[in-house]
Amino acid sequence: MSSHARGKELIPLLSFSHQKKQPNLSISSTTKMNKKNPDQKSDMSSSSSSPKKQTLFISSLIILWYTSNIGVLLLNKFLLSNYGFKFPIFLTMCHMSACAILSYVSIVFLKLVPLQYLKSRSQFLKVATLSIVFCASVVGGNISLRYLPVSFNQAVGATTPFFTALFAYIMTFKREAWVTYGALVPVVTGVVIASGGEPGFHWFGFIMCISATAARAFKSVLQGILLSSEGERLNSMNLMLYMSPIAVIALLPVTIFMEPDVMSVTLTLGRQHKYMYILLLVNSVMAYSANLLNFLVTKHTSALTLQVLGNAKGAVAVVISILLFRNPVTVMGIGGYSITVLGVVAYGETKRRFR
């Protein structure tokens, strides 16, 4: 066979072998692409799961916030009214002691939030003033629980926006739109109706409850005035860190003077009821966790969401307290509380729109 004929035979063989290699290249490239795809899919799945994790985290925070807030309220009522532990000032001092210790551990050791330092004597005096007002509001609220059912206590407490608007106008001359003030009318009207329909109404308890509500509103307005400058502003956890020890020091002499037999009665109750000290400890820890979770919920949600959650929390506390303590309620009382809550919702909405 000639060399020319051999060349003709070799050409198709070479072309055939070249054609066979092409599919191999395409298969290997497809394999590489397939190897990359699982990573891309995992990235997409992780990015899609992160919003779910965030939602789960916020939902858990809200549930814990509700549990701690409502839990400390119901435990306060149980201890002060049903358990024979009639020492609201000492109970408040226990709460403040727990807040002082746990705030220090959370901020200094666990570093849950950055530590902010008091920079001047003037700033310290401002924080001390806020601490005294805060003490008065908590003590007043605890005293009122001795005489009033939780449901009515919450109805009166819902009038906080009314007192906040009042003190803001008196102390800072800050005016809201007239429609905003108009929304406060049902807030007050509802409490008046609820008071008339409350079977367990007690004048001293009512005065202490309304005073505690006013003090709470006064403290929020005063805080905005005293710690208004950027250099003196503290977040709520650092403010609690500095306010709590001052509150304990202020409450100690008041407890000794107004509740002199607190230690003997507490020791007696501790011998009679084996869970007495555990209840006091859990109650005090819950008081701190309510503040911590309130800070975290505020940080991770919007102001509007927080307002809605706060209103719903009051309603949930009322329902649970009625089921637990079985205090009698009337249609008039429920109607009055409902009007108050609707007024608070309307006030928040008008304030947001006419800001």
UniProtKB/Swiss-Prot annotation:
Main location, first listed in the record: membrane
Pfam families recorded: TPT
Any Gene Ontology CC annotation: membrane
InterPro entries: Sugar_P_trans_dom, TPT_transporter
Membrane topology of the entry: Multi-pass membrane protein
Location of this chain's protein in the cell: Membrane
Annotated spans, Disordered: 19-51
Membrane-spanning intervals of the chain: 55-75, 89-109, 124-144, 150-170, 177-197, 198-218, 239-259, 277-297, 305-325, 328-348
Polar residues compositional bias, start-end: 22-32
S-S bonds: none
Keyword Ribonucleoprotein among record annotations: no
Matching PANTHER family: SOLUTE CARRIER FAMILY 35
The protein's name: Probable sugar phosphate/phosphate translocator At3g10290
